[in-house]
Every structure is written in structure tokens, then in C-alpha cells.
UniProtKB/Swiss-Prot annotation:
Entry GO MF terms: protein kinase binding
Protein name: Speedy protein E12
A Pfam family it matches: Spy1
Cysteine pairs bridged by disulfides in the record: none
């Protein structure tokens, strides 16, 4: 009986720590090796106030990255002298000039060229040999007025050409006598019925014959149309000389730009 109790006591005695086999994790590796690879720091509980040390290799790599990031910024940074050179100012001036030219769209040039083929307008231009009512600047103002009125190009008809030409003469010419002839060409009168002096026109109206009454009513209607056309341009009838030259520069070889009073001898 004593021997049996002695064996039982020997089986329950703890074995030395060196002989105990280390516990293994579910993956089959020792638990101590896994903890040493993943956890760093003291085994005692608590938080270490000192930050973890970074290796010199990481610091050197971070410095190289910072230097590589700074290099494109240095290359892309413009020099301050290139911003304030005179060429930049000239470029801005040319850009503003192109913007002013774009106000007159090509469709208004096409409408102007289409109306030049009108037989009544052809007769007016052929009659005005002295260029008193249709020189190149007055005709360029017609294109400017078409642009300012803002109608679609296909809507411009013969009446609009005469309205614009008459309004251009109102703005630029002081002599009223030649301007009155525009009425007669508009209403397709013959050359023999066109008075050359303004006094002859008032003399016709004074007698108040049926033909004179008809002419007076047509002139009154024309002036009414002229007022509406002037309002459609927002009362902007003045055109600068620079804008007129830019309109002519769109097609400098056009035959109407040869109608220059300076070339008359």
C-alpha cells in the first residue's frame, strides 16, 4: 500500500521548467517566437513614453524622397522676369484686338456681299461716282450696323442696306443734299427723277400733287424704319476709325474698299 501511494505522489510532482515543452500555437510554431516578432517593448504592462526608434535606412530613404519631390517644383517654377517682359504686354494687346474683331461675325460679311448683288444697290453704287454717299468707310459702317442690330444674316434685305447707309451718312456727312437721293434709289426711281438739290425736294412737296404725296408717305415710312433700326442697335451709331479699318482688313482685296475719296482727282 505504501508503495502505491509513493508512485502516485511522484506522478503529481511538477517537472522542471527546462524539461517542459514550449506551447505551440494553432499554426504549429512556438508562441514565444510569434510574440517576439510582432510585439516589441517591455513585458511589464503600461505604455512606453519614448517613441519607437526608426532605423537610419528609413531616415535616409525619407530624405531621398523629399529631395526628389522638391526637384520638380524647382524645375516648374517660372522665373519672375518672364512674367513682366514687354512681349507679354504686346500679347495682351493683340488679344484684346482680336476680341474686338470677333464682334463682327463672318455671317454679316456674307449678308453684305449678298446685298451687293441686288440690282438697285448696284445702280446706287454705279451712280455715286463721286463717292459722296457710298465710299469705303460708309460701306464699312453698314457691316458694323448689321452686326450691332443682331438680326440673323438671312433676314437682311435691301431695306436694311439703305437704312444702314442712310444712318451712316447721318453720322459722318454734313451735306444733306446727296443723302436725299437714297430715297429715290430705294423706291426704284429712274435717274432722271432724282433731284440733286434739297430745295427741289421741298418744292415737290409744296405743290402736294398725288406723286408728291406718295413720296412724302414713303419718306415718312422710311424714317420710321430708320428709327426702329437705330433702336435695334441700342442707339450705338458711332463707329471708330480703328474698327472700320479692321472690318476692311477681314477681306482687304474686296472691290468696295477701292472706293476711296482720296484717290479721286
Amino acid at each position: 500500500m505504501g508503495q502505491i501511494l509513493g508512485k502516485i505522489m511522484m506522478s503529481h510532482q511538477p517537472q522542471p521548467q527546462e524539461e517542459q515543452s514550449p506551447q505551440r500555437s494553432t499554426s504549429g510554431y512556438p508562441l514565444q517566437e510569434v510574440v517576439d516578432d510582432e510585439v516589441s517593448g517591455p513585458s511589464a504592462p503600461g505604455v512606453d513614453p519614448s517613441p519607437p526608434r526608426r532605423s537610419l535606412g528609413w531616415k535616409r530613404k525619407r530624405e531621398c524622397l523629399d529631395e526628389s519631390d522638391d526637384e520638380p517644383e524647382k524645375e516648374l517654377a517660372p522665373e519672375p522676369e518672364e512674367t513682366w517682359v514687354a512681349e507679354t504686354l504686346c500679347g495682351l494687346k493683340m488679344k484684346a484686338k482680336r476680341r474686338r474683331v470677333s464682334l463682327v461675325l463672318p455671317e454679316y460679311y456674307e449678308a453684305f456681299n449678298r446685298l451687293l448683288e441686288d440690282p438697285v444697290i448696284k445702280r446706287l453704287l454705279a451712280w455715286d461716282k463721286d463717292l459722296r454717299v457710298s465710299d469705303k468707310y460708309l460701306l464699312a459702317m453698314v457691316i458694323a450696323y448689321f452686326s450691332r442690330a443682331g438680326l440673323p444674316s438671312w433676314q437682311y434685305q435691301r431695306i436694311h442696306f439703305f437704312l444702314a447707309l442712310y444712318l451712316a451718312n447721318d453720322m459722318e456727312e454734313d451735306d444733306e443734299a446727296p443723302k436725299q437721293n437714297i430715297f429715290y434709289f430705294l423706291y426704284e426711281e429712274t435717274r432722271s427723277h432724282i433731284p440733286l438739290l434739297r430745295e427741289l425736294w421741298f418744292q415737290l412737296c409744296r405743290y402736294m400733287n398725288p406723286r408728291a404725296r406718295k413720296n412724302c408717305s414713303q419718306i415718312a415710312l422710311f424714317r420710321k424704319y430708320r428709327f426702329h433700326f437705330f433702336c435695334s442697335m441700342r442707339c450705338r451709331a458711332w463707329v471708330s476709325l480703328e474698327e472700320l479699318e479692321e472690318i476692311q482688313a477681314y477681306d482687304p482685296e474686296h472691290w468696295v474698299w477701292a472706293r476711296d475719296r482720296a484717290h479721286l482727282s
